[in-house]
Amino acid sequence: MAIYLDKLKMPIIIGLIVLIIASLTGYYYYTHNTKTSEIIIFAAGSLKIPLDEIASKYSEKYGVNIYIEASGSVEAIRKVTDLGREADIIAVADYRLIPTFLVPNYTSWYIGFATNQVVLVYTDKSKYHEILENNPSEWYKILMRNDVKWGFSDPNKDPCGYRSVGIIGLASIYYNDTSILENLLLNKTNIAVEKVNDTLNLIVPADLKVSENSNLIIRSKSVDLISLVEAGTIDYAFEYQSVAVQHHLKYIKLPDQINLGNPKYAYFYGKVIVKILVGTDKEKSIAMSPIIYGITVLDNAPHRSEALKFLKFLLGNTGREIFEEKGQPYLDEFIVYGKIPEELRSIAGSES
């Protein structure tokens, strides 16, 4: 009887073994063959909304999973350079960060593709917004009021942050009023200033601090300030115009001479240099210039082929339409550096 039962069990055991092997083989096949059907993107926070929409359309069309991790642009880059994390695409709010931090060790090429400008966002709950709406040139005087809370993002982590610092420096030159710099930056933070010939250098320590009881609020990335403005926790924040449009916030435009959105004033913008991460081996000097977003695929991208296909899709008509709608229009001609991969040359052109 025992022998008979053992004979019955044997086919069952063999069947289970076959099933387990088949399952493991299937899992191995799935994990190894779906690995190329995903893309990992580290992106600037201000790119999150248009990238999400483009990724959704691409995924729907090609069945590819796209993971977008948003942060400040400098922080996005340091995830790769300092933390050793894997990514396929890096998309930043200042294309110059790519040659500064990533070329030549992580990539040999990049594309500058979209523009923006910095504005001051607010709501109907913001103190003195009626004055601002009637007299936009009073913006810096309103920010100087002790009962007004305002903010910008961390210049050591986010381009909108160092651009906000630079804009305050440019405003002090444009309005010929040194009190702007003193009251909005120097008296509220440990940021320092030095004048070198006609250039204003604003020095941002790596351990940036805000004075106690200050009405200035700093957050890691510019989009982190949106919820504070919407809730009335702060009255005003420096943001990209695209962020204001995407979040349906009121905003006032700053003069073209200081908003970093008009290439005509590139020379004037360059009168201010912001030094970030001062006191570390990562210290960089960033001259103010017109805002241009940049993008690249890393040399060691784990899903390089798929990432290049997605980038071609992004730089094409679909991407152009979405970015235009979100307030970040594409350049008439892309800025191209390095030997662009063959897959992109028909749409991005050659090195300029």
From Swiss-Prot:
Q: State if Signal is listed as a keyword.
A: yes
Q: Which GO terms describe its biological process?
A: molybdate ion transport
The cysteines joined by S-S bonds are none
Q: Which domain of life is it from?
A: Archaea
Q: Does the keyword Metal-binding apply?
A: no
What GO annotations for molecular function exist for this entry? molybdate ion binding; tungstate binding
Which residues, if any, are the signal sequence? 1-22
What are the protein's UniProt keywords?
Signal
Q: Which family does it belong to?
A: Belongs to the bacterial solute-binding protein 1 family. WtpA subfamily.
Tell me the PANTHER family matching this sequence: MOLYBDATE-BINDING PERIPLASMIC PROTEIN, MOLYBDATE_TUNGSTATE-BINDING PROTEIN WTPA
Protein name (record)? Uncharacterized solute-binding protein Smar_0280
UniProt organism field: Staphylothermus marinus (strain ATCC 43588 / DSM 3639 / JCM 9404 / F1)
